[in-house]
Swiss-Prot record:
NCBIfam families per the UniProt record, alphabetical: mal_quin_oxido, PRK05257.1-1, PRK05257.1-4, PRK05257.2-1, PRK05257.2-5, PRK05257.3-1, PRK05257.3-2, PRK13339.1
Pathway connected to this protein: Carbohydrate metabolism; tricarboxylic acid cycle; oxaloacetate from (S)-malate (quinone route): step 1/1
Protein name: Probable malate:quinone oxidoreductase
Record HAMAP family: MQO
Length: 494
C-alpha cells in the first residue's frame, strides 16, 4: 500500500491542544525556536477536554491532601515516598510557571493559579488513626513541614467552616496545608498557546488526525481531516509526533503500529460533580477538602469539597460521582472502547478487568444513584448543604491505562504512562491523575527519551527555566526555602 503524498512539512506535530501539548510546545519553542511546529486540535478551541476547568478538579496535585497517594500498609505504617515524588514534580512545574510569568509568556498568575489550602478530613476511629499516622510520616519532610494535624472541631471549623456546620457527634480528624493551590488548567493552556501562535508555531482547530504512517527515514506522514471543509484535508510530514490528545491518544498510538504500543488498552471512567456558584455559600469556603475513597472505588473517586476559581469567579465543587461511558473523550464516540480492542491487548484487558471487579461493582452502584443519594454524600462533608443550590455537571473522561503484566497477565494502572518509540520519533501520554500538575516533569521526561542527544545542549536553558532542575528539594532545606519562596512570591501564592 502506497503512502499518501505530503503537502507540507513540520519539525514537530503535536496532536491535541491541551495542557500537555501546550507545555511541550512551550519547552521546545524555547529550546529550539527555529523548529516549525503544528498543534492540531479536533475541537474548535484549546483545552476543552480534560484541561477545561470544569472537567477536572484543578487541585494543583501536590499530594498534600490526596490520601490515595499514601495508603496504609498491612502493618499500619504509612510511607510518604510516593507523595514526595508527586510534590517534587509539582515544584518543578511551579518553577517553570514562575519563569514564564517573569518573562511575560503567562499573564497575571491569579488568572490561572490561586492560593487555596489543602485539607484532608476523615471520620471515625480507624480513619482518624490512619490520618495521624500519615501526618507523622509526612511532617518530618521539608516539603510537608507546614502541615498541621488536629481533632479539635473548632480549629477544623476555622480551616473549613462549611464542613462543621451542623455536624453531629463522632470523631473527626483533619490535616491542613496552607501552601495548597487551585489551578485553572484551561486558562493556563490558552495563555501558553496564545503566546506561541506565530512564533514558528501554528495552532489549528477543527483538525482531526486520522492516520499515522511511519517512513523509512524515521519521519511520519500525518493525515489530517479538516472537520469544517474536507477540501482542506492534507498530509503533513513530521520529524517528531506527540500524541497529547488525552483519551484520544490511545487510538492514535495504536494507529502508529509501533511495537511499544502493544499490550496497552484503556478503561474509561466518567465523573459527575455537584457545583455551587452562590456567592453567599462560596464566600464561606476556601479550601480543598479531600476524604477517603470507599472500598473498591478508583483513586480519582476520592470525595472532595473543592474551592474553584474559574474566570475570576469563586465556586465550590463536590464529587466526583463515578460513571461509565465507552467514550475515550467527552466529545468522543460510544465506539471508542470497543474499537480499541486488539488481539495484542484483549488478554491484558480481560485479566485487568477480572482483577478489578470491585471497580465494576462501584461504577454500577454509582450509575444507579439518585439525586437524593448524591446529596446525602454531599451532606457527609457539608451537613447543612441546601439541595436547591447545587447543579449536577459532567466532568471529563479519564481513560485509565490497562497494560500487559508478566506476572498478572494484565493490570489496571491509575496514573500517567509515557509511551515512546525506540527511535524517539513519536511519543504518547496515556492515563490520568496527577496529570496536569506534573505536566512539566512529564514533558521533560519525554524530551530525555525522544531527544537524548540534545539534552546536554538544552540543559543550561532548562536550568534557567527550572533553577532546581535535576535536584530534589526535599533533600536540601535551604534550596527548598529559596525555590518555594521565590515561586510563591512570583505566582502570588503562600
Amino acid at each position: 500500500m502506497t503512502s499518501p503524498q505530503p503537502t507540507e512539512t513540520a519539525d514537530v506535530v503535536l496532536v491535541g491542544a491541551g495542557i500537555m501539548s501546550a507545555t511541550l510546545a512551550t519547552l521546545l519553542n524555547d529550546l529550539q525556536p527555529e523548529w516549525r511546529m503544528l498543534v492540531l486540535e479536533r475541537l474548535d478551541a484549546a483545552g476543552l477536554e480534560s484541561s477545561n476547568a470544569w472537567n477536572n478538579a484543578g487541585t494543583g496535585h501536590s499530594a498534600l491532601c490526596e490520601l490515595n497517594y499514601a495508603p496504609q500498609a498491612a502493618d499500619g505504617t504509612v510511607s510518604a515516598e510516593k507523595a514526595l515524588t508527586i510534590n517534587e514534580q509539582f515544584q518543578v512545574t511551579r518553577q517553570m510557571w514562575s519563569s514564564l510569568v517573569e518573562n511575560g509568556t503567562l499573564e497575571d498568575p491569579n488568572t490561572f493559579i490561586n492560593p487555596v489550602p489543602h485539607v484532608s478530613m476523615v471520620f471515625g476511629d480507624d480513619h482518624a488513626d490512619y490520618l495521624r499516622a500519615r501526618y507523622d510520616a509526612f511532617k518530618p519532610n521539608k516539603l510537608f513541614e507546614r502541615m498541621e494535624f488536629t481533632e479539635d472541631r473548632d480549629l477544623i471549623a476555622q480551616w473549613a467552616p462549611l464542613t462543621m456546620h451542623g455536624r453531629g457527634a463522632g470523631r473527626v480528624a483533619a490535616t491542613f496545608a496552607p501552601e495548597g493551590t487551585d489551578v485553572d488548567f484551561g486558562a493556563l493552556t490558552n495563555q501558553l498557546l496564545n503566546h506561541l501562535q506565530g512564533r514558528n508555531i501554528t495552532v489549528e482547530y477543527g483538525q482531526e488526525v486520522t492516520t499515522l504512517d511511519r517512513q523509512s527515514d524515521g519521519s511520519w506522514l500525518v493525515s489530517v481531516v479538516d472537520r469544517l471543509n474536507s477540501d482542506n484535508n492534507r498530509v503533513i510530514r513530521a520529524g517528531f509526533v506527540f500524541l497529547g490528545a488525552g483519551g484520544g491518544a490511545l487510538p492514535l498510538l495504536q494507529k502508529s503500529k509501533i511495537k511499544e504500543a502493544k499490550g496497552y488498552g484503556g478503561f474509561p471512567v466518567s465523573g459527575l460533580f455537584l457545583r455551587n456558584t452562590d456567592p453567599t455559600v462560596t464566600a464561606q469556603h476556601n479550601a480543598k477538602v479531600y476524604g477517603q475513597a470507599s472500598v473498591g472505588a478508583p483513586p480519582m473517586s476520592v470525595p472532595h469539597l473543592d474551592t474553584r476559581y474559574v474566570n475570576g469567579r469563586r465556586a465550590i465543587m463536590f464529587g466526583p460521582y463515578g460513571g461509565f461511558k465507552p467514550n475515550f473523550l467527552k466529545h468522543g464516540s460510544l465506539l471508542d472502547l470497543p474499537k480499541s480492542v486488539r488481539a495484542h491487548n484483549l488478554y491484558p484487558m480481560t485479566r485487568a478487568g477480572m482483577a478489578n471487579l470491585d471497580l465494576v461493582k462501584y461504577l454500577v452502584g454509582e450509575l444507579t444513584k439518585t439525586r437524593s443519594q448524591r446529596i446525602d454524600a454531599l451532606h457527609e462533608y457539608y451537613p447543612t448543604a441546601e439541595e436547591s443550590q447545587w447543579e449536577l455537571i459532567e466532568a471529563g473522561q479519564r481513560v485509565q491505562v490497562m497494560k500487559s503484566d508478566p506476572q498478572k497477565g494484565g493490570v489496571l494502572q491509575f496514573g500517567t504512562e509515557l509511551v515512546t518509540s525506540a527511535d524517539g520519533s513519536i511519543g504518547a501520554l496515556l492515563g490520568a491523575s496527577p496529570g496536569a500538575s506534573t505536566a512539566v516533569p512529564i514533558m521533560l521526561n519525554l524530551l530525555s527519551k525522544c531527544f537524548p542527544a540534545k539534552m546536554s545542549e538544552w540543559e543550561p536553558r532548562i536550568k534557567e527555566l527550572i533553577p532546581a532542575y535535576g535536584r530534589k528539594l526535599n533533600d536540601d532545606p535551604r534550596l527548598t526555602d529559596e525555590i518555594m519562596g521565590h515561586t510563591a512570591s512570583v505566582l502570588g501564592i503562600k
